[in-house]
A protein has these predicted regions:
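Short helix-initiation/N-cap motifs at beta->coil->alpha
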Residues: 30-41, 120-139
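Short, well-ordered beta-strand elements
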Residues: 1-9, 29-32, 94-97
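Pocket-lining segment of extracytoplasmic ligand-binding domains
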Residues: 125-211
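A bilobed periplasmic-binding-protein/Venus flytrap-type ligand-binding module shared by bacterial periplasmic
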Residues: 19, 81-90, 95, 173-188
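A conserved helix-loop-strand patch within extracytoplasmic ligand-binding domains
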Residues: 71-131, 164-166
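Beta->alpha turn/N-cap motifs
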Residues: 11-12, 35-36, 47-59, 71, ...
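Ligand-binding cleft/hinge of the Venus flytrap
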Residues: 15-27, 106-126, 205-212
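Secondary-structure end/capping motifs
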Residues: 184-251
Length: 266
């Protein structure tokens, strides 16, 4: 029986699954595509077995989750697709419009506003990802994914949250990783995910060229994003960044506990 693999339907996920889509790596997965928050919900509801979910969801899991070693979606500076868009100084933000597609970015925005910039948030508003509408109803907006990547930044005051996090903490930020219940995937399945990542990183230019055919920028723009802004490893620095993130989220009451990070190989 195929392992149901929850896949985020964003450009930055493509290098992790391109090899599966193109038949370049043997696997036993059924690929199920959704936005990050829905991937997390489907994993929670056991509609998928393993999924690429926002890191914050590891701390909110109904039972301990394990993660696949060595594969994630992270940044070590500007990420170019996770933004806090402002109509006033960060310290003066009182209301925040949230694009609920990604719970990690929502939690990160609150950590940065409250702990780094000293804002006193009074209210958050769930919203569809339309920047102008969001800013009509709030002091700031969280905008993520392909919409953020293609945002005309000259029109707005923008904080790149990946850059703000790393400048503040000196650590990478991990947005998502392959996650599931303890025995949902075996060593062979984990190895397939690692091989798919390695293969995908060799095909970034081809991925970018195919994506550019239906999007406003050229392949060079998208290739630079995938190869420079996004990092797909999950090393010691990334794990330290995750732990710091969980600790801050716990301090703000966004999660009830700081989880232990367990790998499938353990």
């Amino acid at each position: 029986m195929a392992i149901r693999l929850g896949v985020v339907s964003y450009l930055n996920t493509k290098p992790l699954v391109h090899a599966f889509e193109m038949g370049e790596v043997d696997h036993d997965f059924e690929l199920v595509y959704d936005v990050p928050s829905v991937c997390a919900r489907k994993l929670h509801d056991q509609d998928t077995d393993v999924a690429l979910i926002p890191a914050i969801e590891i701390a909110r899991a109904p039972e301990p989750y394990s993660i696949v070693e060595g594969v994630g979606i992270a940044s070590r500076g500007p990420v170019r697709s996770v933004f806090l868009v402002l109509n006033r100084d960060p310290a003066d933000v009182r209301t925040l419009a949230l694009d609920t597609s990604s719970r990690s970015s929502v939690a990160l925005s609150r950590i940065l506003l409250q702990k780094r910039f000293g804002a006193h948030l009074e209210d958050t508003i769930d919203a569809e990802p339309d920047v102008d509408v969001m800013l009509d109803n709030a002091d700031a907006a969280v905008v993520i994914g392909d919409i953020a990547l293609e945002l005309d930044r000259s029109r707005y005051r923008v904080v790149d949250m990946g850059d703000a996090w790393t400048e503040w903490t000196g650590l990478p930020f991990v947005y998502a990783c392959w996650t599931g219940r303890k025995y949902a995937i075996d060593r062979e399945g984990c190895d397939a995910l690692v091989r798919a990542k390695a293969s995908g990183l060799l095909h970034v230019d081809a991925i970018a060229e195919a994506y550019a055919a239906d999007h406003p920028y050229d392949a060079v723009f998208y290739s630079a994003y995938l190869s420079q802004a996004i990092h797909y490893g999950l090393g010691d620095a990334e794990l330290e960044g995750m732990h710091r993130y969980f600790a801050y989220a716990n301090e703000l009451g966004l999660i009830d506990r700081v989880p232990t990070i367990d790998f499938y190989s353990e």
